[in-house]
C-alpha cells in the first residue's frame, strides 16, 4: 500500500530524520575508528535511545542487530560482529529510526583515510546518483520505473553495475512501504510519484559485475561473488512536493 502523507505526518517523519542527521554528523571516522562493529552498533543504539527514539531494525524479520553495518565486501544488510573498522576500510551504516510511531530509513558510507581510491570514487558516484535522480524528479510525471532506469544508466556511465533484487521503497508510516524502487528499469510494475509521497532512494553499486550471495555465516550480509571489486550503498529519504523533490536526510 502506498501512503500519501498529510502535513502532520510529514513533520513527524522529518522529526525522525533529524535524529539521523545528527548521527551522520557525530559518527565520523575519528569517532568510530578502531572499534568493532558490535561496539559501533551499541553506540548507535545508545545515541538513538538518548533522543527518545528506537532502532527499529532489531527483530525485523529476525534481524539480530540494531543497524545494518556493511564493512568492505558487504554491500547491504551487514550484521554487526567483532570485525574492526580501520583506516583502510569502507563502512556503510544503514539506520532505521522510529520516533513517535513514525520512521526514518537512510544510509551513509564512511571511508577510512587510507581506503583505496577506487572505493572512494565508487562511494562518491553512488552518493551523487541520488542527487542526480532527485533533480530529475517531476511530480505527477516521474515514475518509479524512471528512477530505476536513471539509476542503472548513471552506474553504467562509470562502468559500474547495480544490484538486481534489492532497492528503495516508500517509508514514514511504516519502515518499509510501497512502492518498491528498483535500481533498474522494469515493465513489471511502475508507480507515479505524486505529492506527499515519501520514498527512500538507495543505489547499490558494484564496481564490476553484480552477481551476489547472502553470507551463510549470518544469513543477512549481501556480498559480491566476484571478490576482486569494491561495492557501495547510500540511501536518502525523499519527499515528493508539488513542484519538486526534497531530500529529508541531508
Swiss-Prot record:
The keyword Protease applies. InterPro entries: Creatinase/aminopeptidase-like, Pept_M24, Pept_M24_MAP, Pept_M24A_MAP1. A divalent metal cation 2 binds at residues 105, 169, 202, 235. Its EC number is 3.4.11.18. Substrate binds at residues 77, 176. One of its GO terms (molecular function) is metalloaminopeptidase activity. It is an enzyme of class 3 (hydrolase). PROSITE patterns: MAP_1. It holds the Pfam family Peptidase_M24. The keyword Cytoplasm does not apply. It catalyses: Release of N-terminal amino acids, preferentially methionine, from peptides and arylamides. A divalent metal cation 1 binds at residues 94, 105, 235. This is Methionine aminopeptidase. The gene is map.
Amino acid at each position: 500500500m502506498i501512503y500519501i502523507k498529510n502535513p502532520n505526518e510529514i513533520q513527524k517523519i522529518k522529526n525522525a530524520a533529524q535524529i539521523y542527521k545528527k548521527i551522520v554528523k557525530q559518527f565520523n571516522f575519528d569517532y568510530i575508528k578502531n572499534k568493532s562493529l558490535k561496539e559501533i552498533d551499541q553506540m548507535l543504539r545508545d545515541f538513538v535511545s538518548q533522543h527518545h527514539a528506537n532502532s527499529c531494525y532489531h527483530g525485523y524479520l529476525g534481524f539480530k542487530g540494531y543497524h545494518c553495518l556493511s564493512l568492505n565486501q558487504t554491500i547491504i544488510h551487514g550484521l554487526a560482529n567483532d570485525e574492526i573498522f580501520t583506516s583502510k576500510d569502507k563502512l556503510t551504516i544503514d539506520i532505521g529510526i522510529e520516533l513517535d510511531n513514525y520512521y526514518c530509513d537512510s544510509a551513509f558510507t564512511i571511508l577510512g583515510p587510507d581506503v583505496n581510491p577506487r572505493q572512494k570514487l565508487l562511494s562518491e558516484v553512488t552518493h551523487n546518483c541520488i542527487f542526480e535522480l532527485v533533480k530529475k524528479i517531476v511530480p505527477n510525471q516521474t515514475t518509479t520505473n524512471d528512477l530505476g532506469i536513471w539509476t542503472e544508466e548513471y552506474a553504467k556511465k562509470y562502468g559500474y553495475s547495480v544490484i538486481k533484487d534489492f532497492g528503495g521503497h516508500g517509508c514514514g508510516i511504516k519502515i518499509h512501504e510501497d512502492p518498491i524502487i528498483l535500481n533498474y528499469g522494469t515493465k513489471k510494475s511502475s508507480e507515479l510519484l505524486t505529492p506527499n509521497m515519501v520514498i527512500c532512494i538507495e543505489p547499490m553499486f558494484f564496481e564490476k559485475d553484480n552477481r551476489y550471495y547472502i553470507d551463510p555465516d549470518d544469513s543477512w550480509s549481501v556480498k559480491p561473488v566476484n571478490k576482486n571489486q569494491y561495492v557501495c550503498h547510500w540511501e536518502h529519504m525523499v519527499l515528493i512536493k508539488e513542484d519538486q523533490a526534497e531530500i529529508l536526510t541531508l
